[in-house]
Amino acid sequence: MGTNKKIFFKIKNIKFEYITLLFLLLPIISCNFINMKFKGTGEEQLFINSNKERPCPNKITVDDVIIPNPSCKYKFPNKIVTIKINLNKDIKSFHKMFSDISNIIEIDLSQLDTSLVENMANMFENCNSLIFANLSNIDITSVTNMEKMFSNCISLKSLDLTNMDIAKLTNHKMIFNNCIHLKIHI
């Protein structure tokens, strides 16, 4: 019997891509692990259903608005392999946001507004299948904590950190711990 895990995101304009299908989810729909429920404000709330009868999407693209709860750790299901987020909201912490997603291979945060983010600690920790993280164009001028941000990302091949202003960064302990294949471009 499946269990429901509530994910505390309000999302607008979300698209779920499947291996062979692309769905644009309507206000009330249930398909492949994902139930979107309309809240009357034009925003949806995301629920992950662990029912084994329905396969999980392998890619999520979020455009326009995503509003996480204050602690946004462990928010994505383990079977997703690609995440792309375009964000324009005032969020100060991404602590453990993508940590322990063992199947994720690609994350694109290039359109993410991170100008107010202060904490990126453990953000991708234990994403041991992660090969590519597009962090180009993100603003980390307010970030003070990146401890273990990529720790144990053993498949990560390269990161482009050129043009990143790390003047406020005070904690970067073990940021690339056990990233045995990583090449950094600075």
Question: How does the language model describe each region?
Answer:
Residues 2-116, 183-186:
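N-terminal capping/linker segments that flank leucine-rich repeat
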Residues 28, 149, 153-156:
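Intrinsically disordered, low-complexity segments
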Residues 69, 119, 145:
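Residue-level detector of functional hotspots within protein domains
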Residues 70-71, 99, 121, 133, ...:
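A sequence-composition feature that detects small, non-aromatic residues
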Residues 95-96, 121-122, 147-148, 173-174:
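Register-specific detector for alpha-helical tandem repeat solenoids, activating on a conserved position
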